Amino acid sequence: MSITEEIRKQAIKNAYLHDGRADVKSVVSKLMAEFPEARKNPGDLINDVKKCVDEINSMGKDRIIEIINNEYPEFKIKEKKEEKHELPELPNAKNGVVMRMAPSPSGPLHIGHSRMAILNDEYVKRYGGDLILRIEDTNPGNIDIDAYDMIPEDLKWLDVNVTKTVIQTSRMDLYYREAKKLIENGYMYIAETDQKRFKELKLKSMALPDRSMDPGVHLDRFDKMLNREYREGEAVAVLKTDLNHPNPSIRDWIAFRISYKRHPLTGDEYCVYPMMNFSVAIDDHYLGLTHVIRGMDHLVNTEKQKYIFNYNNWKLPYYYHYGIIKIPGSVLKTSIIKNGIKSGKYTGWDDVRLGTIRALRKRGYRPETFRRYWINSGMKETGATFSWEIFDSINRQLIDRDAMRFFFVNDPVLLDLNNDIDLESHARYHPDIDLGYRKYIIKSHSRIYLSRRDLDDIKPDEIFRLKDLCVVKRTEDGIAYIDDDSNKRLKIIQWCPENSHEFTVQKPDGTVDSGMLEPLAYNYNGVSQFERYGYVNIINRNGYFLHR
């Protein structure tokens, strides 16, 4: 078998194994490893592989599978039954569950939040019951008023079915009532001390003098807190736990604090706010939570919250904690995003450089991609790193059959096409599905756009193919038409006619590609594949890079 035939064979195999897209580096590495003669002229080998890969990647998956079946059956992969990923069963769930999502309204949801939302939603859909959206807004200094609307919008787009919405600041009277009950029963006290001394004593497993005072004193102090008779930091409500607990953070922990910051939703109505662990425990009981699913970072919080359940003789929900997922290459922290929006660095919460649900939606990810990824990840307790490669692969499977194909020429160069006859281009909108053709008439002696990068790779007098148009040769003053022979095995590159439109593609790394987009794509809206470039979401004549 000649090296040319071997290149084609390995490129076909590589494309077959990788969703219809061969990779030049992988094919070259394979050839050099298995065929010593291929190492003699690596430059020529790389160019030959590029030509072959361009041709194969333009075929479409169905055609590649056909070639494998007819020419290289030894490469066929035995079809396996698609592995069905399912979440584990929950105990005592057959009669329905009550579960919750509890985001803070500091901003919209990001990709990490989608895990919590989807796992809870999957179980409620499996067993029936209620999925509660509880907006935890008891920290007045960290609230974005728009988040009260953005969070439900994000969940709706993710196809998460919320059956009830609860806002914690509408339940303050409940928190105050439960606090007074705990004080009366000797489980909570009001500490009139500064934070530094409080922490120092906790680390030594020592009690504040306030701890042993009569509950009546603490009820009076709590009323003074509510009546604004303390300054911020002068008094806090503390839940009694075990001062000898091995984890200092679980020893007597603060349950209420004073804040005179104006709340974006309730204004100045309240000045005493429950800390997260207090309000969560109260709500989980009164909302009837049966099962709680959240990250391993909440393990300590769960231990803290159990004290309130035990003091009140309340039935505990079932707790599940999944491992922490590190999400690389994505901006998620709300404070960083807010500051970036204020400074003009980011255009908004949907800036494609961010990891918010809105940004990923804008780029063109499908809601089902999030669901499949998190179900596949399951509820393992071990930590892991989020795989954008797997996430993109899932999304590619969902979008590919609907994605129209178009030509986009990045960093374009306008060249004379020396053709004595009119040429006609018939390019399929999709290689595997009959969606029709994009038709262009290229008049004699027209001009077309090629990418500067492609042009730099073409040697003088080199013959190559303009995809779905004709065979041409590089000349000193442009390119010259040779023929329409579609059977020649040549390097294939995309092009755009002279009447194409200027177009930009914003990328998640912050760069912007500027080029020309073929006329029939200019008014298109939705995810499309720019051939030899990648998938792009077009929104009102603006392009947002999705993935390759």
From Swiss-Prot:
Gene Ontology CC, one term: cytosol
Keywords on record: Aminoacyl-tRNA synthetase, ATP-binding, Cytoplasm, Ligase, Nucleotide-binding, Protein biosynthesis
SUPFAM superfamilies: Nucleotidylyl transferase, Ribosomal protein L25-like
Key word Cytoplasm present: yes
Domain of life: Archaea
EC number: 6.1.1.17
Subcellular location: Cytoplasm
Catalytic activity entry: tRNA(Glu) + L-glutamate + ATP = L-glutamyl-tRNA(Glu) + AMP + diphosphate
Major subcellular site: cytoplasm
Pfam families to which the protein is assigned, alphabetical: tRNA-synt_1c, tRNA-synt_1c_C
PROSITE patterns: AA_TRNA_LIGASE_I
GO MF entries: ATP binding; glutamate-tRNA ligase activity
An example Gene Ontology biological process: amide biosynthetic process
Intervals of motif 'HIGH' region: 103-113
Keyword DNA damage in annotation: no
Role, per record: Catalyzes the attachment of glutamate to tRNA(Glu) in a two-step reaction: glutamate is first activated by ATP to form Glu-AMP and then transferred to the acceptor end of tRNA(Glu).
PANTHER family with a match to the protein in the record: GLUTAMATE--TRNA LIGASE (PTHR43097:SF5), GLUTAMINE-TRNA LIGASE (PTHR43097)
Protein family: Belongs to the class-I aminoacyl-tRNA synthetase family. Glutamate--tRNA ligase type 2 subfamily.
Protein name (Swiss-Prot/TrEMBL): Glutamate--tRNA ligase
Gene source species: Picrophilus torridus (strain ATCC 700027 / DSM 9790 / JCM 10055 / NBRC 100828 / KAW 2/3)
Gene: gltX
